[in-house]
């Protein structure tokens, strides 16, 4: 699943290509992707309007339209956007929604797993929607701090790895970055969140911000299928220190990296550095 850096990379790419172009038509091949509109309603709300800006909220992409509507998209496991010429070949079997612009280009939503979601809301109330109102601050938000995280988790009985994956506590962090953040902060992934001090949360916050920004700079992490633009891959996978490195020597101390399960999620850690 694309995490904060991958979603931000996609947002940056689309902001560079699809803004301020009139939408000519829409094609919906898989109506279940549209969660609160029919294909006919979707087209009626989009045609003859423009995308004026795109923002990220946690792992959601928010398309702000010129008619004061917001299209909220979650890519889930395998969702991808391609901005391509109308005549350019594409995989029709997995392309479920197409937004065609009046410049001959199309924004194509491709999703092999079909788990992605599209919602349309009024701009003045979209943050009150069921799925968006529970999204917490992410580490790159100006209001995010160690104190914020400490207050959220000081009574939590969850393992800190599990807590960092809870989008109602802190948004945007997924399995890859939780492993890397805890390794950098020298915190064992199964320690209970309530047993960590404010100083521990200061380390987590500092490393989360550093790692996420570095990943954005490197266009995210491609381990399995994440791509942006037209099949471009991220580079941050080359910088991972523990995630995917089970049975390899730790690059800091030489101890063998271990892999375990924490609340069902594959978790990589150094038993020495994170002791």
Swiss-Prot record:
It catalyses: Hydrolysis of DNA containing ring-opened 7-methylguanine residues, releasing 2,6-diamino-4-hydroxy-5-(N-methyl)formamidopyrimidine; 2'-deoxyribonucleotide-(2'-deoxyribose 5'-phosphate)-2'-deoxyribonucleotide-DNA = a 3'-end 2'-deoxyribonucleotide-(2,3-dehydro-2,3-deoxyribose 5'-phosphate)-DNA + a 5'-end 5'-phospho-2'-deoxyribonucleoside-DNA + H(+). PROSITE patterns: FPG_CAT, ZF_FPG_1, ZF_FPG_2. GO terms for molecular function: 8-oxo-7,8-dihydroguanine DNA N-glycosylase activity; class I DNA-(apurinic or apyrimidinic site) endonuclease activity; damaged DNA binding; zinc ion binding. Its cofactor is Zn(2+). Keywords: DNA damage, DNA repair, DNA-binding, Glycosidase, Hydrolase, Lyase, Metal-binding, Multifunctional enzyme, Zinc, Zinc-finger. CDD domains: EcFpg-like_N (cd08966). Binds 1 zinc ion per subunit. InterPro entries: DNA_glyclase/AP_lyase_DNA-bd, DNA_glyclase_Znf_dom_DNA_BS, Formamido-pyr_DNA_Glyclase, FPG_cat, MutM-like_N-ter, Ribosomal_uS13-like_H2TH, Znf_DNA_glyclase/AP_lyase, Znf_FPG/IleRS. Belongs to the FPG family. This is Formamidopyrimidine-DNA glycosylase. The gene is mutM.
């Amino acid at each position: 699943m694309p995490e904060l850096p991958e979603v931000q990379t996609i947002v940056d790419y689309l902001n560079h290509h699809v803004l301020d172009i009139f939408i000519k038509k829409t094609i919906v091949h898989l109506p279940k992707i549209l969660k609160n509109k029919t294909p006919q309603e979707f087209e009626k709300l989009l045609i003859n309007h423009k995308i004026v800006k795109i923002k990220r909220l946690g792992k959601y992409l928010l398309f702000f339209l010129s008619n004061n509507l917001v299209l909220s998209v979650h890519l889930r496991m395998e969702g991808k956007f391609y901005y391509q010429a109308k005549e350019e070949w594409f995989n029709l079997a997995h392309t479920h929604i197409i937004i065609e612009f009046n410049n001959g280009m199309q924004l194509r939503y491709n999703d092999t797993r079909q788990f992605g979601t599209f919602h349309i809301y009024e701009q003045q109330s979209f943050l009150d929607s069921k799925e968006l109102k529970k999204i917490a601050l992410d580490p790159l938000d100006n209001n995010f701090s160690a104190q914020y995280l400490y207050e959220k988790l000081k009574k939590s009985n969850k393992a800190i790895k599990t807590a960092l994956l809870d989008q109602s506590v802190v948004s945007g962090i997924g399995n890859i970055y939780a492993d890397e953040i805890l390794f950098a902060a020298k915190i064992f992934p199964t320690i209970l969140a309530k047993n960590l001090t404010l100083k521990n949360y200061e380390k987590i916050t500092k490393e989360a911000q550093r790692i996420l920004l570095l990943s954005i700079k490197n266009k995210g992490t491609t381990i399995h299928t994440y791509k942006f633009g037209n099949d471009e891959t991220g580079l941050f996978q080359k910088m991972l220190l523990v995630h995917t490195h089970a049975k390899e020597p730790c690059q800091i101390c030489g101890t063998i990296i271990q892999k375990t399960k924490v609340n069902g999620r594959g978790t990589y850690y150094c038993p020495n550095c994170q002791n």
